[in-house]
């Protein structure tokens, strides 16, 4: 049996230059040095370091399988070194996603987000790695549905015999830590009934009907781990493409629609997901709008060839213009829904504190008195004074 290759994409917010919008080059260099030493020592086969917004992203290939403590420990060490540099430079929110001081064999539950898949390499193994900033794991629900279940997006579902049987979606309830497998197209409506609530039901993995993995998403929610708001979850995703999977163009097509996602400023607002090249993955306006990058690689003998910055293409200019128009429109709502998230998503903001402070002032509607407000005497002196 051929040796399997593991692709691990692990990200963390370790501190940003001037607010929450980018990773300092020295932090990326610190992480790269850690990974280069690990590659030299045979812990990993290859790596690439990048960022989206203020999230440092480690892309690694190896042959150790998913959730391997050596690989996760390596990522943890790289993040710690980068965070040390961030603290030396006085960067904002240095080490924000590192919720523990001690590594326990796996980064899951400690703050960083991880998407990993173990595969038998095809003769040509193209993959696309997505990373988003200022949003949550459920932001990939709509694109994944379109990639793997919508024939209006993916022509291969109709005309490619290898895709025609459909795919299996693994959906996770992130509140209850439970999951379910749903077959498409047979259970398409059941799938949509769940994933239309992306704050709770998140697509974690997609499989072909023969069991081969097609896509994987990080599903960690930092507020559920930390018990308070510590930043949005900023997911990463790996998607296999071509030769039995959707074509690269079909994988990218959903991002021509900058759909609304939760996150943006203080993780408490809906906004359009803007597809951008890495050089523009620096959200500034109202700490946004939310951004997503896409890097294309070939994987050969557990080594990375690439990347190609796939959203660095004028074909996505219109999506970016639309995202800016939507951002203009929805920002006009200020603190009102639907721009601001609903109360269930405001649990880790000031809303619970406000409600606690006002709880004794809430009364049954029928018992609410008419308020008496003292007015200043009008300058004209013509109006009557009020109590």
UniProtKB/Swiss-Prot annotation:
**At which positions is Mg(2+) 2 bound?**
54-55, 133, 234
Instruction: Please give the Gene Ontology molecular function terms for this protein.
Output: fructose 1,6-bisphosphate 1-phosphatase activity; fructose-bisphosphate aldolase activity; magnesium ion binding
EC annotation from Swiss-Prot or TrEMBL: 3.1.3.11, 4.1.2.13
Temperature-related activity data read: Highly thermostable. Survives boiling for 1 hour.
Tell me the leader sequence span.
Answer: none
Identify the pathway.
Answer: Carbohydrate biosynthesis; gluconeogenesis
pH effect summary = Optimum pH is 8.0 for FBP phosphatase activity and 7-8.5 for the FBP aldolase activity.
Any idea what job this protein has?
A: Catalyzes two subsequent steps in gluconeogenesis: the aldol condensation of dihydroxyacetone phosphate (DHAP) and glyceraldehyde-3-phosphate (GA3P) to fructose-1,6-bisphosphate (FBP), and the dephosphorylation of FBP to fructose-6-phosphate (F6P).
Which residues does the annotation say bind Mg(2+) 3? 232-234
Q: From the UniProt record, list the reaction(s) this protein catalyses.
A: beta-D-fructose 1,6-bisphosphate + H2O = beta-D-fructose 6-phosphate + phosphate; beta-D-fructose 1,6-bisphosphate = D-glyceraldehyde 3-phosphate + dihydroxyacetone phosphate
Keyword Repeat carried by entry? no
Q: Provide the residue positions that the database annotates as binding beta-D-fructose 1,6-bisphosphate.
A: 20, 92, 105-106, 134, 242-243, 266, 287, 348
**Any idea which positions bind Mg(2+) 1?**
13, 20, 54, 96
One Gene Ontology BP term is: gluconeogenesis
Q: What is known of its domains?
A: Consists of a single catalytic domain, but remodels its active-site architecture via a large structural change to exhibit dual activities.
What residues sit in the active site?
A: 13, 229, 232
Q: Which keywords accompany this UniProt record?
A: Carbohydrate metabolism, Gluconeogenesis, Hydrolase, Lyase, Magnesium, Metal-binding, Schiff base
Q: Where does Mg(2+) 4 bind?
A: 233
InterPro entries, alphabetically? FBPase_V (IPR002803), FBPase_V_sf (IPR036076)
Residues given in the record as dihydroxyacetone phosphate binding sites: 20, 134, 266, 287
Source species of the chain: Ignicoccus hospitalis (strain KIN4/I / DSM 18386 / JCM 14125)
* Gene from which the chain derives: fbp
Family of this protein: Belongs to the FBP aldolase/phosphatase family.
Give the record's subunit note: Homooctamer; dimer of tetramers.
Q: This protein is called what?
A: Fructose-1,6-bisphosphate aldolase/phosphatase
